[in-house]
């Protein structure tokens, strides 16, 4: 659960960084 949650945040962070 924690692993998936962290992965989700990292994915969002990478996506946001890529868009920005």
UniProtKB/Swiss-Prot annotation:
Subcellular location: Cell membrane
A single GO cellular-component term on record: plasma membrane
Record GO terms (molecular function): 2-oxo-acid reductase activity; 4 iron, 4 sulfur cluster binding; molybdenum ion binding; molybdopterin cofactor binding
Enzyme class per UniProt: oxidoreductase
Cofactor, free-text remark: Binds 1 [4Fe-4S] cluster per subunit.
Cofactor names: [4Fe-4S] cluster; Mo-molybdopterin
Activity regulation details: Is inhibited by cyanide. Is sensitive to oxygen.
Keywords assigned: 4Fe-4S, Cell membrane, Iron, Iron-sulfur, Membrane, Metal-binding, Molybdenum, Oxidoreductase
Subunit organization: Forms various types of homooligomers.
Annotated protein name in UniProt: 2-oxo-acid reductase
Natural source organism: Proteus hauseri
Lineage of the species this protein comes from: Bacteria, Pseudomonadati, Pseudomonadota, Gammaproteobacteria, Enterobacterales
């Amino acid at each position: 659960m924690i692993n998936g949650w962290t992965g989700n945040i990292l994915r969002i962070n990478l996506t946001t960084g890529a868009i920005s």
